[in-house]
Protein backbone atom coordinates (compact mmCIF):
# COMPACT_ATOMS: atom_id res chain seq x y z
CA UNK A 1 0.00 0.00 0.00
CA UNK A 2 1.13 3.54 -0.75
CA UNK A 3 2.80 4.98 2.40
CA UNK A 4 0.97 8.27 1.86
CA UNK A 5 -2.41 6.51 1.89
CA UNK A 6 -1.44 4.65 5.05
CA UNK A 7 -0.26 7.86 6.68
CA UNK A 8 -3.44 9.71 5.79
CA UNK A 9 -5.50 6.85 7.21
CA UNK A 10 -3.61 7.07 10.49
CA UNK A 11 -4.02 10.85 10.52
CA UNK A 12 -7.76 10.49 9.95
CA UNK A 13 -7.99 8.05 12.86
CA UNK A 14 -6.00 10.44 15.05
CA UNK A 15 -8.31 13.29 14.09
CA UNK A 16 -11.38 11.23 14.97
CA UNK A 17 -9.92 10.27 18.35
CA UNK A 18 -8.98 13.90 19.00
CA UNK A 19 -12.50 15.08 18.16
CA UNK A 20 -14.08 12.65 20.60
CA UNK A 21 -11.50 13.48 23.27
CA UNK A 22 -12.01 17.22 22.86
CA UNK A 23 -15.77 17.01 23.27
CA UNK A 24 -15.50 14.72 26.30
CA UNK A 25 -12.85 16.90 27.92
CA UNK A 26 -14.96 20.02 27.72
CA UNK A 27 -18.03 18.24 29.08
CA UNK A 28 -16.03 16.73 31.94
CA UNK A 29 -14.76 20.16 32.92
CA UNK A 30 -18.33 21.49 32.73
CA UNK A 31 -19.84 18.81 34.96
CA UNK A 32 -17.08 19.38 37.52
CA UNK A 33 -16.72 23.18 37.26
CA UNK A 34 -13.07 22.89 36.37
CA UNK A 35 -11.21 25.69 34.59
CA UNK A 36 -12.01 29.39 34.73
CA UNK A 37 -15.69 29.21 35.82
CA UNK A 38 -14.80 27.16 38.90
CA UNK A 39 -13.64 30.30 40.68
CA UNK A 40 -17.07 31.82 40.08
CA UNK A 41 -18.73 28.83 41.74
CA UNK A 42 -16.33 29.10 44.65
CA UNK A 43 -17.25 32.76 45.16
CA UNK A 44 -21.01 32.12 45.04
CA UNK A 45 -21.54 31.46 48.79
CA UNK A 46 -19.76 34.71 49.58
CA UNK A 47 -22.31 36.46 47.36
CA UNK A 48 -25.18 34.80 49.24
CA UNK A 49 -25.85 32.08 46.64
CA UNK A 50 -25.88 28.60 48.15
CA UNK A 51 -25.60 26.08 45.32
CA UNK A 52 -25.67 22.40 44.34
CA UNK A 53 -22.88 22.60 41.78
CA UNK A 54 -19.77 20.43 41.79
CA UNK A 55 -16.59 22.43 42.34
CA UNK A 56 -13.73 19.97 41.98
CA UNK A 57 -10.93 21.85 40.23
CA UNK A 58 -7.70 20.69 41.83
CA UNK A 59 -5.78 22.62 39.17
CA UNK A 60 -6.21 24.08 35.71
CA UNK A 61 -7.27 21.77 32.89
CA UNK A 62 -3.84 21.54 31.18
CA UNK A 63 -2.06 20.38 34.33
CA UNK A 64 -4.89 18.05 35.32
CA UNK A 65 -5.17 16.32 31.96
CA UNK A 66 -1.43 16.16 31.57
CA UNK A 67 -1.49 14.16 34.81
CA UNK A 68 -4.43 11.89 33.95
CA UNK A 69 -3.13 11.13 30.46
CA UNK A 70 0.39 10.65 31.79
CA UNK A 71 -0.86 8.07 34.30
CA UNK A 72 -2.86 6.23 31.64
CA UNK A 73 0.00 6.33 29.15
CA UNK A 74 2.54 5.08 31.69
CA UNK A 75 0.36 2.17 32.78
CA UNK A 76 -0.42 1.22 29.18
CA UNK A 77 3.26 1.41 28.23
CA UNK A 78 4.29 -0.87 31.10
CA UNK A 79 1.56 -3.39 30.31
CA UNK A 80 2.50 -3.49 26.63
CA UNK A 81 6.23 -3.80 27.27
CA UNK A 82 6.35 -6.12 30.28
CA UNK A 83 3.20 -8.22 29.93
CA UNK A 84 2.81 -8.05 26.14
CA UNK A 85 -0.81 -7.06 26.63
CA UNK A 86 -2.69 -6.10 23.42
CA UNK A 87 -2.66 -2.39 22.70
CA UNK A 88 -6.39 -1.77 23.14
CA UNK A 89 -6.54 -3.67 26.42
CA UNK A 90 -3.44 -1.95 27.79
CA UNK A 91 -4.78 1.51 26.93
CA UNK A 92 -8.17 0.64 28.44
CA UNK A 93 -6.59 -0.54 31.71
CA UNK A 94 -4.49 2.61 31.86
CA UNK A 95 -7.56 4.78 31.29
CA UNK A 96 -9.45 2.95 34.05
CA UNK A 97 -6.66 3.54 36.57
CA UNK A 98 -6.43 7.19 35.53
CA UNK A 99 -10.21 7.53 35.97
CA UNK A 100 -9.94 6.11 39.50
CA UNK A 101 -7.23 8.63 40.41
CA UNK A 102 -9.26 11.37 38.73
CA UNK A 103 -12.36 10.48 40.75
CA UNK A 104 -10.40 10.42 44.00
CA UNK A 105 -9.05 13.90 43.38
CA UNK A 106 -12.54 15.08 42.37
CA UNK A 107 -14.02 13.96 45.70
CA UNK A 108 -11.29 15.39 47.91
CA UNK A 109 -11.08 18.64 45.96
CA UNK A 110 -14.83 19.25 45.99
CA UNK A 111 -15.13 18.46 49.68
CA UNK A 112 -12.21 20.70 50.52
CA UNK A 113 -13.59 23.62 48.56
CA UNK A 114 -17.11 23.28 49.96
CA UNK A 115 -15.94 22.87 53.56
CA UNK A 116 -13.86 26.03 53.20
CA UNK A 117 -17.11 27.86 52.40
CA UNK A 118 -18.91 26.60 55.51
CA UNK A 119 -18.43 29.99 57.16
CA UNK A 120 -20.86 31.30 54.54
CA UNK A 121 -23.36 28.52 55.40
CA UNK A 122 -22.65 26.51 52.24
CA UNK A 123 -23.67 22.87 52.93
CA UNK A 124 -22.05 19.75 51.50
CA UNK A 125 -24.66 17.81 49.50
CA UNK A 126 -23.49 14.19 49.48
CA UNK A 127 -26.23 13.04 47.10
CA UNK A 128 -25.16 15.62 44.54
CA UNK A 129 -21.50 14.62 44.88
CA UNK A 130 -22.17 10.90 44.42
CA UNK A 131 -24.47 11.43 41.43
CA UNK A 132 -21.85 13.44 39.57
CA UNK A 133 -18.92 11.06 40.01
CA UNK A 134 -20.13 8.82 37.17
CA UNK A 135 -20.12 11.52 34.48
CA UNK A 136 -16.78 12.84 35.75
CA UNK A 137 -15.13 9.41 35.63
CA UNK A 138 -16.82 8.44 32.37
CA UNK A 139 -15.88 11.56 30.45
CA UNK A 140 -12.37 11.40 31.91
CA UNK A 141 -12.00 7.77 30.77
CA UNK A 142 -13.00 8.68 27.22
CA UNK A 143 -10.49 11.51 27.12
CA UNK A 144 -7.54 9.52 28.44
CA UNK A 145 -8.35 6.51 26.26
CA UNK A 146 -8.46 8.62 23.10
CA UNK A 147 -5.38 10.66 23.98
CA UNK A 148 -3.25 7.62 24.80
CA UNK A 149 -4.51 5.94 21.63
CA UNK A 150 -3.62 9.03 19.61
CA UNK A 151 -0.18 9.08 21.20
CA UNK A 152 0.36 5.41 20.40
CA UNK A 153 -0.46 6.01 16.73
CA UNK A 154 2.32 8.60 16.63
CA UNK A 155 4.87 5.93 17.56
CA UNK A 156 3.96 3.55 14.73
CA UNK A 157 6.84 2.77 12.29
CA UNK A 158 5.19 4.59 9.39
CA UNK A 159 6.75 7.35 7.25
CA UNK A 160 5.86 10.66 8.85
CA UNK A 161 5.34 9.11 12.30
CA UNK A 162 7.69 6.90 14.40
CA UNK A 163 8.01 9.66 17.00
CA UNK A 164 11.18 9.34 19.11
CA UNK A 165 9.39 10.28 22.35
CA UNK A 166 8.06 7.37 24.45
CA UNK A 167 4.33 6.84 24.85
CA UNK A 168 4.02 8.26 28.41
CA UNK A 169 5.72 11.53 27.45
CA UNK A 170 3.56 11.94 24.35
CA UNK A 171 0.47 11.29 26.45
CA UNK A 172 1.51 14.00 28.92
CA UNK A 173 2.14 16.53 26.14
CA UNK A 174 -1.17 15.81 24.40
CA UNK A 175 -2.96 15.87 27.76
CA UNK A 176 -1.62 19.35 28.42
CA UNK A 177 -2.65 20.37 24.91
CA UNK A 178 -6.22 19.11 25.16
CA UNK A 179 -6.56 20.76 28.55
CA UNK A 180 -5.52 24.07 27.04
CA UNK A 181 -7.89 23.67 24.09
CA UNK A 182 -10.80 22.75 26.34
CA UNK A 183 -10.08 25.64 28.65
CA UNK A 184 -9.83 28.25 25.89
CA UNK A 185 -12.58 26.98 23.58
CA UNK A 186 -15.26 25.58 25.83
CA UNK A 187 -15.20 27.99 28.77
CA UNK A 188 -17.41 30.69 27.32
CA UNK A 189 -20.21 28.20 26.72
CA UNK A 190 -20.28 27.47 30.45
CA UNK A 191 -19.19 30.55 32.35
CA UNK A 192 -20.73 33.24 30.20
CA UNK A 193 -23.92 31.57 29.01
CA UNK A 194 -25.11 29.07 31.58
CA UNK A 195 -23.72 30.50 34.78
CA UNK A 196 -24.78 34.11 34.19
CA UNK A 197 -28.10 33.76 32.41
CA UNK A 198 -29.59 36.64 34.38
CA UNK A 199 -27.17 39.09 32.73
CA UNK A 200 -27.28 40.38 29.13
CA UNK A 201 -25.40 38.14 26.74
CA UNK A 202 -22.44 39.72 25.00
CA UNK A 203 -21.40 42.02 27.81
CA UNK A 204 -18.71 39.77 29.24
CA UNK A 205 -18.27 39.00 32.94
CA UNK A 206 -16.99 42.07 34.82
CA UNK A 207 -15.31 41.54 38.17
CA UNK A 208 -18.23 43.20 39.94
CA UNK A 209 -20.54 40.25 39.20
CA UNK A 210 -18.10 37.41 39.98
CA UNK A 211 -19.89 34.83 42.10
CA UNK A 212 -23.36 36.20 41.29
CA UNK A 213 -24.28 32.99 39.51
CA UNK A 214 -27.62 31.47 38.54
CA UNK A 215 -28.63 28.84 41.10
CA UNK A 216 -32.19 28.06 39.96
CA UNK A 217 -32.84 25.72 37.06
CA UNK A 218 -35.94 25.30 34.91
CA UNK A 219 -37.21 22.99 37.66
CA UNK A 220 -35.68 23.12 41.11
CA UNK A 221 -32.10 23.96 42.03
CA UNK A 222 -29.47 24.01 39.33
CA UNK A 223 -26.76 21.39 39.45
CA UNK A 224 -23.86 20.38 37.25
CA UNK A 225 -26.01 17.91 35.31
CA UNK A 226 -28.01 20.85 33.98
CA UNK A 227 -24.79 22.56 32.98
CA UNK A 228 -23.29 19.62 31.11
CA UNK A 229 -26.61 18.95 29.35
CA UNK A 230 -26.60 22.53 28.11
CA UNK A 231 -22.95 22.41 27.02
CA UNK A 232 -23.36 19.09 25.20
CA UNK A 233 -25.43 20.91 22.59
CA UNK A 234 -22.73 23.32 21.47
CA UNK A 235 -19.71 23.85 23.73
CA UNK A 236 -18.59 20.21 23.79
CA UNK A 237 -18.90 19.52 20.04
CA UNK A 238 -17.22 22.83 19.23
CA UNK A 239 -14.27 21.98 21.48
CA UNK A 240 -14.02 18.54 19.89
CA UNK A 241 -14.05 20.04 16.41
CA UNK A 242 -11.34 22.52 17.38
CA UNK A 243 -9.01 19.89 18.82
CA UNK A 244 -9.71 17.42 16.01
CA UNK A 245 -8.96 20.06 13.39
CA UNK A 246 -5.71 20.97 15.15
CA UNK A 247 -4.52 17.36 15.22
CA UNK A 248 -5.58 16.61 11.65
CA UNK A 249 -4.12 19.77 10.13
CA UNK A 250 -0.91 19.39 12.14
CA UNK A 251 -0.13 16.01 10.56
CA UNK A 252 -1.94 16.09 7.23
CA UNK A 253 0.27 18.71 5.61
CA UNK A 254 3.50 16.92 6.59
CA UNK A 255 2.25 13.61 5.18
CA UNK A 256 1.21 15.18 1.87
CA UNK A 257 3.86 17.88 1.30
CA UNK A 258 6.83 16.61 3.31
CA UNK A 259 8.69 18.50 6.04
CA UNK A 260 9.50 21.74 4.17
CA UNK A 261 6.23 21.86 2.28
CA UNK A 262 4.36 21.01 5.46
CA UNK A 263 5.87 23.98 7.29
CA UNK A 264 4.96 26.34 4.46
CA UNK A 265 1.42 24.99 4.12
CA UNK A 266 1.03 25.11 7.91
CA UNK A 267 1.92 28.80 7.98
CA UNK A 268 -0.58 29.45 5.20
CA UNK A 269 -3.30 27.58 7.10
CA UNK A 270 -2.58 29.55 10.28
CA UNK A 271 -2.75 32.85 8.38
CA UNK A 272 -6.06 31.88 6.79
CA UNK A 273 -7.49 30.87 10.17
CA UNK A 274 -6.46 34.20 11.70
CA UNK A 275 -8.21 36.10 8.90
CA UNK A 276 -11.30 33.88 9.12
CA UNK A 277 -11.49 34.28 12.89
CA UNK A 278 -11.27 38.06 12.62
CA UNK A 279 -13.98 38.25 9.95
CA UNK A 280 -16.25 35.93 11.93
CA UNK A 281 -15.85 37.89 15.16
CA UNK A 282 -16.47 41.24 13.46
CA UNK A 283 -19.57 39.83 11.74
CA UNK A 284 -20.96 38.38 14.98
CA UNK A 285 -20.44 41.59 16.93
CA UNK A 286 -21.98 43.77 14.23
CA UNK A 287 -24.87 41.41 13.55
CA UNK A 288 -25.87 40.45 17.09
CA UNK A 289 -23.97 42.43 19.71
CA UNK A 290 -25.29 42.75 23.28
CA UNK A 291 -28.93 42.14 24.08
CA UNK A 292 -31.08 45.28 24.06
CA UNK A 293 -34.37 45.83 25.83
CA UNK A 294 -37.40 46.66 23.72
CA UNK A 295 -38.18 50.35 23.84
Curated annotation (Swiss-Prot):
The chain crosses the membrane at residues 4-24, 60-80, 87-107, 140-160, 161-181, 234-254, 255-275. Keywords: Cell membrane, Membrane, Methanogenesis, Methyltransferase, One-carbon metabolism, Transferase, Translocase, Transmembrane, Transmembrane helix. The keyword Repeat does not apply. It catalyses: 5-methyl-5,6,7,8-tetrahydromethanopterin + coenzyme M + 2 Na(+)(in) = 5,6,7,8-tetrahydromethanopterin + methyl-coenzyme M + 2 Na(+)(out). Its main location: membrane. GO terms for molecular function: tetrahydromethanopterin S-methyltransferase activity. Pathway: One-carbon metabolism; methanogenesis from CO(2); methyl-coenzyme M from 5,10-methylene-5,6,7,8-tetrahydromethanopterin: step 2/2. Belongs to the MtrE family. This is Tetrahydromethanopterin S-methyltransferase subunit E. It comes from Methanothermobacter thermautotrophicus (strain ATCC 29096 / DSM 1053 / JCM 10044 / NBRC 100330 / Delta H). The lineage of its organism: Archaea, Methanobacteriati, Methanobacteriota, Methanomada group, Methanobacteria.
Amino acid sequence: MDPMITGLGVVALMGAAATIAGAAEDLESDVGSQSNPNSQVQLAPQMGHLHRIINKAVSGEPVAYGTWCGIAGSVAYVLMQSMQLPVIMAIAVGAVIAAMVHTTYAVTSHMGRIVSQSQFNQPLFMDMLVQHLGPIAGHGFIVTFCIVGLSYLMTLPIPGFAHPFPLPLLAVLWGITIGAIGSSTGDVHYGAEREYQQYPFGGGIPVAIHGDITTKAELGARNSMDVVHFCAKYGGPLTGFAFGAIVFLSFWNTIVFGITGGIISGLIIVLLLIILNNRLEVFARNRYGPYKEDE
